[in-house]
Regions:
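Short coil/turn segments at alpha/beta junctions that flank glycine-rich nucleotide-binding fingerprints
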Residues: 26-30, 80-81, 102, 145, ...
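C-terminal peripheral helix-coil segments that are non-catalytic and often amphipathic
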Residues: 1-3, 93-101, 132-145, 163-164, ...
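Hydrophobic alpha-helical connector segments
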Residues: 61, 75-105, 154-161, 184
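Helix-turn-helix
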Residues: 15, 19-57, 61
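Amphipathic alpha-helical segments used for helix-helix packing
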Residues: 100-119, 170
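N-terminal intrinsically disordered/low-complexity leader segments
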Residues: 1-11, 15-18, 81
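Hydrophobic/aromatic residues within well-ordered alpha-helical segments
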Residues: 55, 62, 66, 70, ...
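Amphipathic alpha-helical packing segments from all-alpha helical-bundle domains
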Residues: 68-71, 75, 119-145, 154-159, ...
Length: 197
């Protein structure tokens, strides 16, 4: 069994995820072998199967770790003691920033999610739905209180915003004309403008 950490103290699961993320981004999920992943991580196949069970589990975890981070942050924004407009704007901008910060993970997942088994695909969709429902609840709270317009259904507003977020990997470039925070601010402001009465 591989050492639990490497010379820098990085635990085996994180090494495997980092190696898989890099290789999936460079070569594609379907063209990356388990052998390449374990060699890049400096571990044995036994270590991979101990921590993840399969290459498919690695793919699922690449996306799930970002979604967990985003869910925790959304919950924090949603529960904050602030006006609903500010909470929604903060959450809308944050999901853009965290997606850009993890662009390889998001890109890999959306390109490769069709490789997941129906069971794993369903699990990921349920986790995403939970996130979207919490986000939608902020929109609905603002609509009920009269802060936001009810002219457009909350579901459509949420789909509009997340359509933009999910396609960041197709056009955003770190060396482009906008910083990640500028993109986040623009998209959050677009969302709020769409909701103004």
């Amino acid at each position: 069994m591989a050492k639990a950490t490497d010379g820098s103290g990085t635990p085996v699961p994180q090494r495997l995820l980092a190696a898989a993320t890099r290789l999936f981004a460079e070569q594609g999920y379907d063209r990356t072998s388990v052998q390449e992943i374990v060699e890049a991580a400096g571990v044995t196949k036994g270590a991979l199967y101990h921590y993840f069970g399969s290459k498919e589990d690695l793919l699922q975890e690449v996306y799930a770790r970002v979604l967990r981070l985003q869910q925790e942050r959304l919950d924090s924004f949603a529960d904050a003691d602030a006006p609903v407009e500010q909470r929604l704007r903060d959450a809308a901008a944050d999901v853009v920033v965290t997606t850009i910060e993890n662009l390889d993970d998001a890109s890999i997942f959306f390109r490769s999610m069709h490789h997941l088994s129906p069971e794993k695909n369903k699990q990921v969709r349920l986790e995403r739905r939970r996130y979207h429902e919490r986000f939608r609840a902020l929109v609905e709270e603002g609509q009920r209180s009269g802060v936001f317009s009810t002219a457009t259904p909350a579901d459509l507003i949420v789909d509009y915003h997340f359509g933009s977020v999910h396609h960041l990997s197709t056009w955003y470039r770190p060396d482009g004309p906008l910083t990640q925070q500028e993109v986040a601010d623009h998209l959050a402001d677009l969302l709020l403008r769409a909701l103004r009465p």
